[in-house]
């Protein structure tokens, strides 16, 4: 079987390859089958994709006894042509493949950048490489999804602003509050809980377990049923949200709480978060309620009731001190005041102050929350407020820059004054040297000097080495 190749170059680095195959094999003559010429046409472009067609030419009337049919320039009497498409190039599919490849490369680069600029500064230098290696090996998919998700990517960018701040942990938690979604949760579950790529923050003893005597000895969990507001909180990271309305009910021997609260946005708006927590009572210490066995970060919260007053009155309250732990942080904590009223009753403050002292806290440091739960401001108002705050921020930064410039000018002025003073002092020293020089001249030398009426420099030139070397000072 003869096979020849002919290439035709087209525009834009495209080429057309023609493969011509002639039926010169003797088997075709003996078989009596209709001979067929096959031409393969392959179009190749510079993007590496091909479009191939096969052209069949069948001879209906021809004599195969003549070997001239096997020549390159055969005369064809009657040709029946048909096309068979082998592979069709889909432009959309090709572009999709290219974009997918570029997107994968972008994601890989973004992962490396996240490791370099976000994760590494957040952990100790010893653990930095281990953390990045673990994420790239164990949580590559979750990290790629995070970078591709706007909220999760914004969370990563927000975390970058927390590096090396005094309130670094609190800043990181606020970032999570603002940008939390399912993608963020999946990344945290892999990096923190499942693969433990991120080191756990140790307990520093800020919120220790309270003394048993500081906890109420008798408490009925059924008294917690109904709606309660958190009207005051100790920890600004966990306790001081607006519109904290929690509704509790009993399920068998467990207390179930449906918790809702608001997260403020940067433009003055808000969005509402919610969670469900289940508590069991400590049989040996009724004032202790435990919320364990949670899937998300395996967090565990222990509540200790320091004081309570439940008489179905507007000033009913429950003073809760809590501490907790999860896969990311061991030993976080805080304290909240639950009241039936959306505002803190003044009449219960003395009781709260006494209870706060029992755990070494000052109730004056608690933060009053806003439970008015009003509607979200209109978008125009929020934009105006944001613009005003931005203007205030610019003015503040301009004032700070001006103050820094003034300080630099003062430093330069002080430097110039110091230099001038040193020059003046040096000039005085030269005058003193000159006076000492003249004073120590001998009588004969002074007479000669007076006669010559020379200056000190001229005297030095005149006498040269003849003048006695003396220590003038």
UniProtKB/Swiss-Prot annotation:
Annotated TM spans: none
Compartment annotation: Plastid, Chloroplast thylakoid membrane
Topology versus the membrane: Peripheral membrane protein
Signal peptide: none
InterPro entries linked to this entry: Calycin, Lipocalin_CS, VDE, VDE_dom
Means of activity regulation: Inhibited by DTT.
Summary of pH dependence: Optimum pH is 5.0.
Cellular component, GO, one term: chloroplast thylakoid membrane
Coiled coil: 383-463
Any GO MF annotation of the entry: violaxanthin de-epoxidase activity
SUPFAM superfamilies the UniProt entry points to: Lipocalins (SSF50814)
Record has Oxidoreductase as a keyword: yes
EC number(s) from the headed UniProt entry: 1.23.5.1
Keywords of the record: Chloroplast, Coiled coil, Membrane, Oxidoreductase, Plastid, Thylakoid, Transit peptide
GO biological process, one term: xanthophyll cycle
Catalytic activity: all-trans-violaxanthin + 2 L-ascorbate = all-trans-zeaxanthin + 2 L-dehydroascorbate + 2 H2O; all-trans-violaxanthin + L-ascorbate = all-trans-antheraxanthin + L-dehydroascorbate + H2O; all-trans-antheraxanthin + L-ascorbate = all-trans-zeaxanthin + L-dehydroascorbate + H2O
Other observations noted: Associates specifically at acidic pH with monogalactosyldiacylglyceride (MGDG), the major lipid of thylakoids.
Similarity annotation: Belongs to the calycin superfamily. Lipocalin family.
Function summary: Part of the xanthophyll (or violaxanthin) cycle for controlling the concentration of zeaxanthin in chloroplasts. Catalyzes the two-step mono de-epoxidation reaction. Stereospecific for all-trans xanthophylls. Zeaxanthin induces the dissipation of excitation energy in the chlorophyll of the light-harvesting protein complex of photosystem II.
Name of the protein in question: Violaxanthin de-epoxidase, chloroplastic
Gene: VDE1
């Amino acid at each position: 079987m003869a096979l020849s190749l002919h290439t035709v170059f087209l525009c834009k680095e495209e080429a057309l390859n023609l493969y011509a195959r002639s039926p010169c094999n003797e088997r075709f003559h003996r078989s009596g089958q209709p001979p067929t010429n096959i031409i393969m046409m392959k179009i190749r472009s510079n993007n590496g994709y091909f479009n191939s067609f096969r052209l069949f030419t069948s001879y209906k009337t021809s004599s195969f006894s003549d070997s001239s049919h096997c020549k390159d320039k055969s005369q064809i009497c009657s040709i029946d042509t048909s096309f068979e498409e082998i592979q069709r190039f889909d432009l959309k599919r090709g572009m999709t493949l290219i974009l997918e490849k570029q997107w994968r490369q972008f994601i890989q680069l973004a992962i490396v950048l996240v490791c370099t600029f976000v994760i590494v500064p957040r952990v100790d230098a010893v653990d930095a490489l281990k953390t990045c290696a673990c994420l790239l090996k164990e949580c590559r998919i979750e990290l790629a999804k995070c970078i591709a998700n706007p909220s999760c990517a914004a969370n990563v960018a927000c975390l970058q602003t927390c590096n090396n701040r005094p309130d670094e942990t609190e800043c990181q938690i606020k970032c999570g509050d603002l940008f939390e979604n399912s993608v963020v949760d999946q990344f945290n579950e892999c990096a923190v809980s499942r693969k433990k790529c991120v080191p756990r923050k140790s307990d520093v003893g800020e919120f220790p377990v309270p003394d048993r005597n500081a906890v109420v000895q008798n408490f009925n969990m059924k008294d917690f049923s109904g709606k309660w507001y958190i009207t005051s909180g100790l920890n600004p990271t966990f306790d001081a949200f607006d519109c904290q309305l929690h509704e509790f009910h009993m399920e068998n021997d467990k207390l179930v709480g449906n918790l809702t609260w608001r997260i403020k946005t940067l433009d003055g708006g808000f969005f509402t978060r919610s969670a469900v927590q289940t508590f069991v009572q400590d049989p040996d210490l009724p004032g202790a309620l435990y919320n364990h066995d949670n899937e998300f970060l395996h967090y565990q919260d222990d509540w200790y009731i320091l004081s309570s007053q439940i008489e179905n009155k507007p000033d009913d309250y429950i003073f809760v001190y809590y501490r907790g732990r999860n896969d990311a942080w061991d030993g976080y904590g805080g304290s909240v005041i639950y009241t039936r009223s959306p505002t803190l009753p003044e009449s219960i403050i003395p009781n709260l102050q006494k209870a706060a002292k029992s755990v070494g806290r000052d109730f004056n440091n608690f933060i009053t929350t806003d439970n008015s739960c009003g509607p979200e401001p209109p978008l125009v108002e929020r934009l105006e407020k944001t613009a005003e705050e931005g203007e205030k921020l610019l003015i503040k930064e301009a004032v700070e820059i001006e103050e820094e410039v003034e300080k630099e000018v003062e430093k330069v002025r002080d430097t110039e004054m110091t230099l001038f003073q040193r020059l003046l002092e040096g000039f005085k020293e030269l005058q003193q040297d000159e006076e000492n020089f003249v004073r120590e001249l001998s009588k004969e030398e002074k007479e000669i000097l007076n006669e010559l009426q020379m200056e000190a420099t001229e005297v030095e030139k005149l006498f040269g080495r003849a003048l006695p070397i003396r220590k003038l000072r």
